[in-house]
């Protein structure tokens, strides 16, 4: 496969962009090759600047649940752009988009739009602290909630990919307010609340972890979290930036039947444009300015382009209700990967929830970050490079999810497994 132009662009990019990229995992550092530069995408496919075609399972890290450049989403953006791209003032689209989120997600009575998932989680944490008048927060080892200071402790995603345990620039005094616990260990949560319960403002969790690779919650885990947080007067925050409108129209909380106090959103709700949101019970959300004392603002928050793209995507998801179809596609890939691994006696674990999948290169069942880290990252890197060479674009990290879209055809899935079989032969 020729990627000469991508290599030239990456070399040039490093003169102007830190590491040649605007987000660390894009540099392909963990998989031992140079990144490909994308020229265009349509449906389930992307094309790089050298003209190579790929079946895409990154989908911009999750937002493109209807595939690349969906005609109706693109048209919605075009129509709005003709009238202006940003006003820094209220628009009717913001109301329509807010109503769509509130109607879809049972626990959300009010919402505030921001520009990224990181902004959403940072704002939700500030709100939880302001509402409860407490300082400490609980997060889980390997869960990634953006790059806000309070949350970039024992994080997943690019932090895990690059093997960074924490990061310089976060004061120890602030980091000490974050209690980090193992995912799926309810006893650890109970113990933490026994020790610090009166000081804990909130628990924030990915209801299905995606940033250490896909890890599902154990049975009754979320209900126990809900019970414990209620008992101690702490807020439960579901970070549904990845899972919201992807695992079900009402998100992971619909799937598991749990009503958190606050929810953060991103990715799917923007239709591929920059967006984030946080929402929850009216009583809590009315602590946010201008109604309440907790300040949060943004020049481009609720901008018309993101609202138009997101609203059209949510409308289509409601009309199509593709979640059973997406689950079936996910199951087909999951079973296919497992069968191939069995053929070659390969030590892998395939974790999946709906249209999110991770193939872990380990013989140990993955239920938390500690078990995820037993994966052979070198073997994953070889698998990644082999699949890329054969036209299958996967996340460039062992600790990320593959995403499916409505645009992925049965032929795409079969071709993916065929190429995977060829790669497992080499491995």
UniProtKB/Swiss-Prot annotation:
Its EC number is 5.4.3.8. The modification N6-(pyridoxal phosphate)lysine is found at residue 267. Pathway: Porphyrin-containing compound metabolism; protoporphyrin-IX biosynthesis; 5-aminolevulinate from L-glutamyl-tRNA(Glu): step 2/2. It is found in: Cytoplasm. GO terms for cellular component: cytoplasm. It catalyses: (S)-4-amino-5-oxopentanoate = 5-aminolevulinate. GO terms for molecular function: glutamate-1-semialdehyde 2,1-aminomutase activity; pyridoxal phosphate binding; transaminase activity. InterPro entries: 4pyrrol_synth_GluAld_NH2Trfase (IPR004639), Aminotrans_3 (IPR005814), Aminotrans_3_PPA_site (IPR049704), PyrdxlP-dep_Trfase (IPR015424), PyrdxlP-dep_Trfase_major (IPR015421), PyrdxlP-dep_Trfase_small (IPR015422). Keywords: Cytoplasm, Isomerase, Porphyrin biosynthesis, Pyridoxal phosphate. Its cofactor is pyridoxal 5'-phosphate. Homodimer. Belongs to the class-III pyridoxal-phosphate-dependent aminotransferase family. HemL subfamily. This is Glutamate-1-semialdehyde 2,1-aminomutase. It comes from Sulfurihydrogenibium azorense (strain DSM 15241 / OCM 825 / Az-Fu1). The gene is hemL.
């Amino acid at each position: 496969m020729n990627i000469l132009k991508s290599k030239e662009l990456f070399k040039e990019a490093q003169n102007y962009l830190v590491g040649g990229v605007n987000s660390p995992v894009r540099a392909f550092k963990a998989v031992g090759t140079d990144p490909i530069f994308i020229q265009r995408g349509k449906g389930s496919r992307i094309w790089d600047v050298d003209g190579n075609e790929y079946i895409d399972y990154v989908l911009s890290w999750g937002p493109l649940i209807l595939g690349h450049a969906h005609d109706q989403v693109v048209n919605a953006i075009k129509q709005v752009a003709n009238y202006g791209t940003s006003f820094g003032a209220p628009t009717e689209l913001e109301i329509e988009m807010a109503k769509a989120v509130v109607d879809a997600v049972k626990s959300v009575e009010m919402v505030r739009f921001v520009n990224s998932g990181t902004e959403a989680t940072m704002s939700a944490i500030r709100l939880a602290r302001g509402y409860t008048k407490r300082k400490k927060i609980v997060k889980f080892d390997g869960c990634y909630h953006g790059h806000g200071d309070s949350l970039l402790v024992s994080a997943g995603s690019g932090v895990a990919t690059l093997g960074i345990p924490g990061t310089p620039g976060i004061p120890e005094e602030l980091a000490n307010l974050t209690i980090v616990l193992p995912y799926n260990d309810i006893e650890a949560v109970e113990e933490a609340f026994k020790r610090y319960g009166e000081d804990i403002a909130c628990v924030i969790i990915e209801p299905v972890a995606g940033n250490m690779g896909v890890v599902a919650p154990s049975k009754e885990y979320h209900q126990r979290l809900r019970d414990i947080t209620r008992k101690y007067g702490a807020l439960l925050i579901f970070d549904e930036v990845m899972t919201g409108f992807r695992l079900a129209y009402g998100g992971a909380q619909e799937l598991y039947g749990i009503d958190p106090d606050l929810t953060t959103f991103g990715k799917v709700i923007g239709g591929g444009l920059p967006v984030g949101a946080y929402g929850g019970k009216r009583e809590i959300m009315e602590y946010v300015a201008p109604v309440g004392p907790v300040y949060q603002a943004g020049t481009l928050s609720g901008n018309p382009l993101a609202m138009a793209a997101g609203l059209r995507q949510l409308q289509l998801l409601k009309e199509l209700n593709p979640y059973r179809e997406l689950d079936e596609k996910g199951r087909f890939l999951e079973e296919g990967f497992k069968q191939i691994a069995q053929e070659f006696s390969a030590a892998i674990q395939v974790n999946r929830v709906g249209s999110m999948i991770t193939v872990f290169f380990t013989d140990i069942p993955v239920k938390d970050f500690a078990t995820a880290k037993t994966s052979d990252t070198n073997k994953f890197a070889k698998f990644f490079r082999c699949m890329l060479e054969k036209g299958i674009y996967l996340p460039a990290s062992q600790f990320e999810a593959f995403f499916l879209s409505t645009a992925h055809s049965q032929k795409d899935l079969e071709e993916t497994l065929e190429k995977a079989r060829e790669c497992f032969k080499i491995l």
